[in-house]
Structure formats: structure tokens, C-alpha cells
Amino acid sequence: MITRRALVDPLARQPLKTSTNILRAASIIPRCTFGSTASSAAADKTSSTWKLAKVPHRGVVQVSGRDTVKLLQGLVSNDVKALDSTTLTHQPPNMVYAGFMNPQGRMLADVFIHRQPANQDGSPRWLLDIDSRTLPSLVAFIKKFKLRSKVKLTDLSTDYHVVQAWDSNSQAPPTIAEKLSIDPRSPSIGYRGVLSAAEILDVAAAASTVDGLEYTLHRITNGVAEGALDFPQASSLPLENNLDYMHGVDFRKGCYVGQELTARTHHTGVVRKRIVPLSFYLAGTPPPASIHDVDPAFPHQLPTHLAEIRSKPISTASEAATKPARGKAAGKFTSGVYNVGLACLRLEQVRRWADSSSADPNSKHDALEFSVLSADGETTLLARPWIPSWWPHDQPVPSDQDT
């Protein structure tokens, strides 16, 4: 059994404040440590434009005991030995991002592993930041491999809260840099941490507290997937979920559950589908010029979870129009807010998207238009996919015919 304790949530829900500034990509400064006092925190907030949000749908599980490193090293996709201060000659990082896979190589959940001060006996004590909707099943999965290992699992979801801090272009205030860790998933996503109520109040003094929905919007517009909706349990692959691009996979570490398929996919270099951000719009209207063109007043419902996104050739005279395969499903919608979202799409089709209203006939050659049905079951939404700027530029785009 895992124990639960109650604690008052220090981040009360506040009205969403959407502005173009908070949607722009941030320049993240490497993490450094500063002293923190109440006066410095107050000074931070005076000039800071940083945002702080409680991350929605995240739970916290403590893993402690002398076999913690060994157990998790065999279960997650990244090298957690980097967190083990007992075996390193240098200061270890405070956080590692990774994924849990089942034996078939399908992803179960994403996880942030946060290093905490060791137990009195010197054994590790780590906090797992995972989706609260899959927490029970993931704990059960870990226990299958725990066996007689000297490891204790404790649900601390009511004692600790997962928070994210970010800004458009400035260096993190000292309080944020000290209390949180750089989120490795993308250069613009910000800082992340698991904090107690008192620690959150300290960090909140150096930033503006915003609604969790604003963090979700920031994450989606930066093309960063997270949680149970974007990573359907036991049905998606870690590389399709961009775990490799988000520094969540170490291909040099030894075996772990699900490693064989992940390694084989990496070494063949063929990943046909990946999660990308989308902008939604209606036929007869111009597509958004940027993923950051967010419309909080978008009047239509977004698609249902895992709704099929289809593509069709824009030009009926193109060679593609004669091939039925070009009209097949392009991928599936995973999550969204307002008029933006994320979807796992075929890259070969993503690169062929074009604006059907373009006056240039050359731009329509072999080009595709993407559409998906709204949750109301009647409205057809057009979708414009985007390739995040932080993706590696030397990655090939495989054809649907590649073997």
C-alpha cells in the first residue's frame, strides 16, 4: 500500500491571462545556484516577467531505499545513475527526464525524476513526477519489478506539487534558478520542480502565478508533449513521442524494459511519425501565420482524443491525386486548447502541407491539406502542422514507402 497525506494547495486557481508575450520562445540560461532570502525574492518579482504555474494532472511518488538506483535504471529510458551522488565525483544534476515502457517497447508514461536529500542512512530518495491519471497503474508496474528490492514507494501527491516557470527572454531570478531545474525537453520550455507548499510560496514571490492552462498553452505552442493524453498508455512509441529529441533517452546505457525496440528504431533511423504542434482554422479562412497565433475565442470544439486527422491532395491534377494511399489517415490528434493542439502525424505528409487558398499554382504541386472532425461531429476543421524550431535539422524525413 502507498500512503497519502493531505495538504492545502497554495496555488489557488486564477483567471487565465493570455498574451502574445508569454507565447514566444524563451532563451533558457544554464542552471546556477544562488542564496535566497525574502528580500531578494521580493526584488526578483519587482522586475521579473516570469510565470509560475502548477502543472495540471501531475502526481508525485517518492522512491527511496538502497536499491532505488538499480531498480529505476532497469525501468526507464534515460541514465538515472547521473542522479546518484554517491558514485559521482562531480555535482550531479537535480532532475532527469525519461519514459517508462512495457516489455513490447510501447510507452507507459513520461517521468521527471527529481533528486532529493538522501535518507539518514545515506540511501537515495527520489521523487517521480508523473501523470496523476496513470499513477496507480504505473506504481503497480514498478512493483512487479520491485520484488525483494530494498525500495519503498510512497504517494506524496498531496504533500508536493509539480510547478513550471518560464519567461520570454530574460534570465531566471535567483529564487527560481535555485529551487527549480532546467527542463531539458526544449530550449524554451523553462524550469521545473517538485516543491512543498512553503517552497512554492517562496518561488511565487519571484514570479507571477498563472493558471495551469497557461502552462499547457505555453507547452503546446512550443511543440512539447506531456502526460496521458499525448502519450496514450501502451500504444505509442517513445521516438514517435519525441523522447529522443527531448533528451529523454540514453542510447548508450544498458538494458531496460522496452529497450530493444527503442534501440532498433533508433539505429534504423526510420521514424515515420512524430508528435507535432497544430493550428486549427476553418475552410475559407487564411491559416494562422504562426503557431503562436492563438485565438482564445475560437468558436469551435477541438477534436476528440485520438480523432483521425486525414490528408487530401490540394490539386486534382497532381500525380498524388491519382493514388488512393495519399488520402489515408495522416495521424491522430492527442490534445489541445483554443485553436492549437498536438498530433502524431506522418512526417512525409507534414512536409507537404500547403495553404489551399494560395494563389501560386506551383505551391500546390503534390501538396496536401489536413482536416479533422470537431468534437461536435459536424464541423470540419482544417489543420496546419508545424515543425518545432528546436528539432535537429539534420534528421531525414522518411517516405511512407520506406522499408
UniProtKB/Swiss-Prot annotation:
- Keywords, sorted A to Z: Mitochondrion, Transit peptide
* Region forming the signal peptide: none
Asked whether the UniProt record includes rRNA processing among its keywords, one would answer no
Q: Which GO terms describe its biological process?
A: iron-sulfur cluster assembly
Q: Tell me which domain of life the UniProt entry assigns to the organism this sequence originates from.
A: Eukaryota
A Pfam family per the record = Beta-barrel_CAF17_C
User: What cystine linkages occur within this chain?
Assistant: none
Q: Which GO terms describe its molecular function?
A: transferase activity
- InterPro entries attached here? TrmE/GcvT_dom1, YgfZ/GcvT, YgfZ/GcvT_CS
What compartments host this protein? Mitochondrion matrix
Q: Where is the transit peptide?
A: 1-108
Q: Which GO terms describe its cellular component?
A: mitochondrial matrix
Q: Which family does it belong to?
A: Belongs to the GcvT family. CAF17/IBA57 subfamily.
PANTHER family in the record: TRANSFERASE CAF17, MITOCHONDRIAL-RELATED
The protein, known as: Iron-sulfur cluster assembly factor IBA57 homolog, mitochondrial
Phylogenetic classification of the source organism: Eukaryota, Fungi, Dikarya, Basidiomycota, Ustilaginomycotina
The UniProt gene name for this protein comes to: CAF17
